[in-house]
Each structure stands twice: as C-alpha cells, then as structure tokens.
Amino acid sequence: RVYHADDICVGQAFIEMYRRFDDKRMLQPVMERAYYVASHPSKAPLQKTDAVGTTERWSWSDALFMAPPVYAALYTITGDKIFLNYMDSEYIECVDSLYDKEEHLFYRDNKRIPLREKNGSKQFWGRGNGWVFAGLPLIVDNLPLNCSSRSYYIRLFTEMAEAVRKTQCKDGDWRTSLLDPDSVSYTHLRAHETRG
C-alpha cells in the first residue's frame, strides 16, 4: 500500500529518531517513499469506497493525521517543496470534500455526507474529527514560521477548536457522533482533543 496514509504515518517515528540522533539513514526509507508518492500522485478519485485504490488518496478524515505531518517535516528537513506542495494539494482537496463549512467539522468520508443521526443532525464521527484536530498542530509545528501555507492550517485549527469545544457534553466527554448527545460516549476522543 504505497499511497495509503496509514502506512506513511510510521514515518513520524523515523523523523523523530532522525531528529534525536541526527542520522540521515533513519530518514531514507520514509523520504524515498514520500518522494515517490509526491512525484507520482495517485489518479484515484477522492472518494473512499470499498473498491480497490480508493484509499490511495486522503479520502477519509483519519488520513489527515496520518500522512501530512510526515510531509510537513520532510519539507522542513530537506527544503524540497515537492513535499509541501503535495501535502497542501491533497490536504486542501480533502478539506474541500469533507469539511462542513457551517459546522466546522469533518465527515469521516464522502459516504457519510448525506447521512443523518436519529436526532436529525449531520453525522460527524468523533474519532475522525479527533484525528484531524490532533494532526493540525503536528503540521503547524513541522512547518517553518515563514511558510506561506502555515496560516491555512492555523485557521482550520482555530475553526475546529471552537466547534469541538461546543460539542463537548456536560459530562466532559464527547460522543461518537459529535452533534448527537444521545450517541455513545467516546473516551477515546479525549486524548485527541487534549493533544490538539
């Protein structure tokens, strides 16, 4: 799965090892893979389905935590804009596809957009939004202060922070579906929200 965001995520660990030990050999495999993906972007549609190849793109919310911090860090480490340009392009396309501009939350994937909860609310998966929210600081922290796209990620984080705050229930927890307070409590989300 060369393109799958989950399989690029492991690069975050290699990048941290490189930063700690200053050994470029630790970066080589992740850099080669990320460079290949960025220089040969998938032509698959940005629609997650059960069909083969639909996870080659960042077509589900979790992917925005998995791969972008790797590309941001590789851009900063190498100075090669191919990493930044690829990250920005894929990220923005995913946001344009899955981010609800009214609620400032993400649908898990395009199949969820028309779905509604029992209370009639839009279906925003708590864990997926937690992944996105926790990933944004990793992207921002990995970009140089003068990077032109940094403000895009900061703005998105700020919008989401307010939306996430509003969805927190009286018991201090979030729900599996963020706009349905009667859905199951989701303690897993606490870690993501705290990290963000």
Task: Enumerate the language-model features and the residues they cover.
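Blade-loop segments of beta-propeller domains
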Residues: R1-M17
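Conserved small/polar residues in nucleotide/adenosyl-binding loops
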Residues: T187-G196
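Acidic/His metal-coordination segments adjacent to aromatic residues that form catalytic metal sites
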Residues: Q47-G53, D109-K122, T176-S183
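Loop-centered beta-sheet repeat module
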Residues: L84-P137
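Long, well-ordered core segments of solenoidal/helical folds
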Residues: R1, Q28-K48, K81-Y107, I154-G172
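Oxyanion-binding "anion nests"
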Residues: F133-L178
